[in-house]
Regions:
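Phosphate-group recognition and catalysis centered on beta-loop-alpha active-site segments
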Residues: 21-314
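Bacterial N-terminal signal peptides that target proteins for export
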Residues: 1-11
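Bacterial N-terminal signal peptides
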Residues: 9-19
Length: 314
């Protein structure tokens, strides 16, 4: 059976198993990874507007906190890769040379201008995408983005979901902030805290997901993201263990699904051209877990895959 017959293909983001479909669904569910980030600078409201206009079913929000505890939509705990913070606040870097969002108030972050992602050398990380340079784009708060998406839903007659990741919860805890509680506070304020069919919450840290389920008692579906142990995530999780039957038994006790790296599922092609897959998906489904692999990108195809269409068709 082809992979697309086991899951719903999600363009540039994740896959959902058939069990996650509504009875009326008959086409792939699209989750926009950082918005339409291949066309417009990631996580800006412009990227989210374009994703909405392109028909995304879910739009992703990576969330970090400001120094005054406000959830903002930003992929990194640092600001310099996607904003002009170094030019506006040159004296605010820590000893490691990085500019941390947690060291700035929301008022200060509102003065920044967002741009296409850059590398350590200051050059575009993805040449050929949106050009670098000054512009009007800014860093939105989570509350602002929810209002923005809700407004577009109303004007366009749609119902778009949120796919929220808690970034670096242990870092935030060491800085004296409870990112899980602050994000849930925003969802309560905006009336999204009970929308089980419209919100997913994801995190690489199992303790944070257990806290969300057991202490904060959120009814929203939780996704345990699975990294590679070599990546150095700020968590005590053994991601190799999570890919075993025993590890998935543990995940099933607090989460509704897993978000594995695509290469933890796709193992390459055999000599006859057939696709080799790991047992991870089957093991997860045996335990009633949804599977949301990341990330399907036309500009970063796995070895042996010649086109994005082929990637979706494995």
């Amino acid at each position: 059976m082809r992979l697309w017959q086991q899951y719903l293909a999600l363009i540039a983001a994740v896959l959902l198993p058939w069990a996650a479909m509504t009875a009326a669904a008959s086409s792939p569910i699209v989750i926009a990874h950082r918005g339409a980030s291949g066309y417009v600078p990631e996580h800006t409201l412009a990227a989210k507007a374009m994703a909405h206009a392109m028909g995304a079913d879910y739009i992703e929000q990576d969330v970090v906190l400001t120094g005054d505890g406000i959830p903002i939509v930003l992929h990194d705990i640092h600001l310099e890769s996607t904003t002009d913070v170094a030019a506006r606040f040159p004296d605010r870097a820590r000893r490691d040379g990085r500019f941390y969002a947690i060291d700035f108030t929301l008022a200060e972050i509102r003065t920044l201008r967002a741009h296409e992602r850059t590398g350590a050398d200051g050059n575009a990380a993805f040449p050929g995408r949106f050009p670098l340079g000054p512009g009007p784009l800014t860093v939105p708060t989570l509350a602002e983005e929810i209002d923005f998406i809700s407004g577009m839903d109303r004007s366009r007659g749609r119902r778009t979901g949120l796919y929220i990741e808690f970034k670096a919860p242990n870092f935030h805890r060491r800085e004296g902030h409870d990112i899980a509680r602050r994000v849930l506070d925003v969802l309560v304020e905006k009336g999204y805290d009970q929308r089980r069919n419209q919100v997913f919450l994801q995190c690489f840290d199992d303790a944070t997901l257990r806290y969300l389920r057991d202490t904060l008692q959120t009814p929203l579906p939780l996704i345990q993201l699975i990294a590679d142990n070599s990546w150095g995530e700020d968590s005590d999780v053994d991601y190799d263990f999570l890919q075993t039957a025993a590890g998935l038994d543990a995940v099933a006790s607090y989460a509704d699904g897993i978000g594995p790296w695509l290469m933890q599922i796709y193992r390459g092609k055999q000599a006859d051209g057939s696709v080799e897959l790991s047992s991870l998906v089957a093991l997860a489904h045996e335990r009633g877990l949804q599977v949301h692999p990341y990330t399907f990108r036309a500009d970063q195809l796995p070895a042996g895959i010649d086109s994005f269409a082929e990637l979706l068709d494995i």
